[in-house]
């Protein structure tokens, strides 16, 4: 069935999707030939889409958009998680550039740089040049900006879907559970009846979803049932169909009381589920700091990674959970951990546009020059995403680091230079002071000699004679023997006869010190002798007159 060019087939003539899949081949259903019968695309020269022929197929799609509808490419799989929910708010940036054109007609859809219609389709490619250059080989489904990440050529941001964290509680149907599982889930059975059930039934029995009574009771917060099962020593680390333990479900469902009881009885907190998440990942996602602290206390690995390579810290940054990120930093989480694309916590924070988390990470002296697998740094992502506040934060941090490094390099050299200059000045000063002290001593001695000579000339002789009676009378009062004591030599005995032994045993420095002390003592002795001699000469002269 091929319609004539320019005509549209009736909606009733459209085949069901199951028959359509085999005919689609490489064409997606929007471009499938029968949509317009042209063999090219479902748009005409006006560029308008006529979706009237798609009503039957659309009714089958339900909540799935055309991107993720399993029959879109005949793959039978969707491009997002099992929930199929699209965050349309994240598409605003791309939609604003696309105008009225859908992503299937968007010139960069196939990475070819051309539209999927002829030149008559009136596609305005000029408006798409900037975006097209960033998209590279990625089609609009996988282009990172579709998820609001602002990244390119690293991997689809859609890989970081939250499907693992969606719908944490079990979907339970009564007909799928036996008596023990019903009692564990609803918890309305009296304790006595529950004890009887445990005697008659295997407490570790699994239902169709591989859930035990402990799984159901923990996920629904029935702490009394959990306590009874633990007292009966049930198995703690059994996995359900998602490879989750009862502890993981309790943490995921934020049933802290049940989780603490399981930890106290020795449940392993590091068992990953099919997504690679541990109980700590779910505690961080829920921003449950108390539960995260308890898990770390019982040995949870703070550096465990899920299938995306996200540690609890990277997960907290990706989900913009600022409080738990701050908590993990205090617990010494590795700030340089990398996800599977080589992205650090700082790069993830920049890509998410979280200035507060970027500022928090910069306070920890994190490496801002780290590159991911595509060779991009945090600053390059900030510039390409036009996060002006984050760009300013990174620039300020870089300037501070440059000033810090320059100050650390300059201070030691200046201090060493100043110290050497001060030391040289001190040595020069000590050398100059010693000759001055030595030169002052002869001047003092010469001054004393001049006074004696002047006094002797005053009395007319340099050689004065004294009568015996005057001499005896003058000295009687002092208790002397009547003789004027002979004048002592100016040079002390120690200088007249130097001790050669001392010179041999003392170092040069010690000899210099002793020499200075002896010279000072000699100077004082000579001055005293001169004064005494002068006084006695004056007294003798007065008695003669």
UniProtKB/Swiss-Prot annotation:
PROSITE patterns linked to this entry: ANK_REP_REGION, ANK_REPEAT
Gene from which the chain derives: POTEH
Compositional bias per record (Polar residues), positions renumbered to this chain: 513-524
Placement of ANK repeats on the sequence: 180-208, 209-238, 242-271, 275-304, 308-337, 341-370, 374-404
SUPFAM superfamilies xref list: Ankyrin repeat
Keywords: ANK repeat, Repeat
Coiled coil stretches, renumbered: none
Signal peptide: none
Basic and acidic residues: compositionally biased ranges: 414-429, 443-458
Native organism: Homo sapiens (Human)
Gene3D superfamilies: Ankyrin repeat-containing domain
Region (Disordered): 406-524
Protein name per Swiss-Prot or TrEMBL: POTE ankyrin domain family member H
Assigned protein family: Belongs to the POTE family.
InterPro entries attached to this UniProt entry: Ankyrin_repeat_domain, Ankyrin_rpt, Ankyrin_rpt-contain_sf
């Amino acid at each position: 069935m091929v319609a004539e060019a320019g005509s549209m087939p009736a909606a009733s003539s459209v085949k069901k999707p199951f028959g359509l899949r085999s005919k689609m081949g490489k064409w997606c259903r929007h471009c499938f030939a029968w949509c317009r019968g042209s063999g090219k695309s479902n748009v005409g020269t006006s560029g308008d889409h006529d979706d009237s022929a798609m009503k039957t197929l659309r009714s089958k799609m339900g909540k799935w958009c055309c991107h993720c509808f399993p029959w879109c490419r005949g793959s039978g799989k969707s491009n997002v998680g099992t929930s199929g929910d699209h965050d349309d708010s994240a598409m605003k940036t791309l939609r604003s550039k696309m105008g009225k054109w859908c992503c299937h007609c968007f010139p960069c859809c196939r990475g070819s740089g051309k539209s999927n219609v002829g030149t008559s389709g009136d596609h305005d490619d000029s408006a798409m040049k900037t975006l097209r250059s960033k998209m590279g080989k990625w089609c609009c489904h996988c282009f990172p900006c579709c998820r609001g990440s602002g990244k390119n050529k690293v991997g689809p941001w859609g890989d970081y879907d939250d499907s693992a964290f969606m719908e944490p509680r079990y979907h339970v149907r009564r007909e799928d559970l036996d008596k023990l599982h019903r009692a564990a889930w609803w918890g309305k059975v009296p304790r006595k009846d529950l004890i009887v059930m445990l005697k008659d039934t295997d407490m570790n029995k699994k239902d169709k979803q591989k859930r035990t009574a402990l799984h159901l009771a923990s996920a629904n917060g029935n702490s009394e049932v959990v306590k009874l099962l633990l007292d009966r020593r049930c198995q703690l680390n059994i996995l359900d169909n998602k490879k989750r333990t009862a502890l993981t479900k309790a943490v995921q469902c934020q049933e802290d009381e049940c989780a603490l009881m399981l930890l106290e009885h020795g449940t392993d907190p590091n068992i990953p589920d099919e997504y690679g998440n541990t109980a700590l990942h779910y505690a961080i996602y829920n921003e449950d700091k108390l539960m995260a602290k308890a898990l770390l206390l019982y040995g949870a690995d703070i550096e465990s990674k899920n299938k995306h390579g996200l540690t609890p810290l990277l997960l907290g940054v990706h989900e913009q959970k600022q409080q738990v990120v701050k908590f993990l930093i205090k617990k010494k989480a590795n700030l340089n951990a990398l996800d599977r694309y080589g992205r650090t916590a700082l790069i993830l924070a920049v890509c998410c546009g979280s200035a507060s988390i970027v500022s928090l990470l910069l306070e920890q002296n994190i490496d801002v020059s780290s590159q991911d697998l595509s060779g991009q740094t945090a600053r390059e992502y900030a510039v390409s995403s036009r996060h002006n506040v984050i760009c300013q934060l990174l620039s300020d941090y870089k300037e501070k680091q440059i000033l810090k490094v320059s100050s650390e390099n300059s201070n030691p050299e200046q201090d060493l230079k100043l110290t050497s200059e001060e030391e040289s000045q001190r040595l020069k000063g000590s050398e100059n002071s010693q000759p001055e002290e030595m030169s002052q001593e002869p001047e003092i001695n010469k001054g004393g000699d001049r006074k004696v000579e002047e006094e002797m000339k005053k009395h007319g002789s340099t050689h004065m004679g004294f009568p015996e009676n005057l001499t005896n009378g003058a000295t009687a009062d002092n208790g002397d023997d009547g003789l004027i004591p002979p004048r002592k030599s100016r040079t002390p005995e120690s200088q007249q006869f130097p001790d050669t032994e001392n010179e041999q045993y003392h170092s040069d420095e010690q000899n210099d010190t002793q020499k200075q002390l002896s010279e000072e003592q000699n100077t004082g002795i000579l001055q005293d002798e001169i004064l005494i001699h002068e006084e006695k000469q004056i007294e003798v002269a007065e008695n003669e007159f």
